[in-house]
Amino acid sequence: MASGAAQNSSQMACDSEIPGFLDAFLQDFPAPLSLESPLPWKVPGTVLSQEEVEAELIELALGFLGSRNAPPSFAVAVTHEAISQLLQTDLSEFKRLPEQEEEEEEEEEEKALVTLLDAKGLARSFFNCLWKVCSQWQKQVPLTAQAPQWQWLVSIHAIRNTRRKMEDRHVSLPAFNHLFGLSDSVHRAYFAVFDGHGGVDAARYASVHVHTNASHQPELRTNPAAALKEAFRLTDEMFLQKAKRERLQSGTTGVCALIAGAALHVAWLGDSQVILVQQGRVVKLMEPHKPERQDEKARIEALGGFVSLMDCWRVNGTLAVSRAIGDVFQKPYVSGEADAASRELTGSEDYLLLACDGFFDVVPHHEVTGLVHGHLLRHKGNGMRIAEELVAVARDRGSHDNITVMVVFLREPLELLEGGVQGTGDAQADVGSQDLSTGLSELEISNTSQRS
């Protein structure tokens, strides 16, 4: 079973940090926020739909608590408790009346189906729920906030590169169960990379909502791959509604990996990719969606669209991806339906690598193992900065795109040196590009290496 081990020493250090964090927090915020008090963290837009509230407040909470260096396990637990309390209240007081605008009648009918809530009011109410929970926990921190966390070494690096804007986003969520209050015996960890185009809105939205939507799928426990597929579909549907309301035109490809017990489940849209390395050999888990793929080309043409070769293969002469969240004006040719696959883990797996096309367009799969092994040799088994080196390789090879690389070690990096590089070719997994489950802020450079 490929999973990190809970580290008691790390947890003891975390436990000792919680009282100090609570004391400092309540000293800075001695009372709930009044209506006149400035909000201590950026509000996610002006309005939220009912379906968006939980995910957006989770993002707000984790960003705010992270900025105050809250212990990670505590941040997840207090976020879950505060949001649970807020969602049990009547949110109708935050309902926003639609603005009076001259709109097409059809658009007005569509808007009427969505209840919009005031984001600023929700954020203020949530901060007060957070304050209330922290006040209660200052007296007695519950065991759930001190529960041992599974340890993962995750190396992440992202750069804007030569592009004007950074449109990539990524998610590293080893405490998936704790964040969503899942109490079964299956440990779950979630990792994702989203590669936006035409703006950052879609990538940011997907990085906030896909895992929250997945957590609510009934199939999460019985068919996780199907749950991930549905989470992508639902996120696309929600973002399209937002895009029509706010006149957004962006889209995003994406890839995610959910480790659930002794199984790995992946889902993807577009050309962001994930590979698994096992005993020094690349295991191909997926086939990226590209317009030149014969099945994708046939699907697009059957809908009345076309695929043409310009500087690269493009859908309807515009987008270089055939599936994505968003891209409201290219639906249904650019599909929001993800593919998914599953694989049992044996404990012999080395690491996962998730990356956008800014990396994989210039670094083929079969070169990854050699690059990682060389880095570990030079750094005596320390994998903390491996993602940074992989990004540098892609940049030096001429990638001009945003580049994001995430390496999730499934074994201690030092152990990987003992066997050497056993193979550099691709091994085809027993999963393909179909569902076989039954067989952070916009920064130019983001570097994260963590035990989480």
Curated annotation (Swiss-Prot):
Q: Which reaction does it catalyse?
A: O-phospho-L-seryl-[protein] + H2O = L-seryl-[protein] + phosphate; O-phospho-L-threonyl-[protein] + H2O = L-threonyl-[protein] + phosphate
GO terms (molecular function) for this protein are: calmodulin-dependent protein phosphatase activity; metal ion binding; protein serine/threonine phosphatase activity; protein tyrosine/serine/threonine phosphatase activity
Q: Which Gene3D superfamilies match?
A: PPM-type phosphatase domain (3.60.40.10)
In this protein, which residues make up the domain named PPM-type phosphatase?
153-410
The residues the record assigns to binding Mn(2+) 2 are 195, 357, 401
Q: Which Pfam families match?
A: PP2C
What's the EC number here? 3.1.3.16
BP-aspect Gene Ontology terms: apoptotic process; cellular response to xenobiotic stimulus; intracellular signal transduction; negative regulation of cell-cell adhesion mediated by cadherin; negative regulation of DNA-templated transcription; negative regulation of protein transport; positive regulation of cell-substrate adhesion; positive regulation of chemotaxis
Q: Which GO terms describe its cellular component?
A: cytosol; perinuclear region of cytoplasm; protein-containing complex
State how it assembles: Associates with FEM1B.
The name this protein carries in UniProt is Protein phosphatase 1F
Q: Which organism is it from?
A: Mus musculus
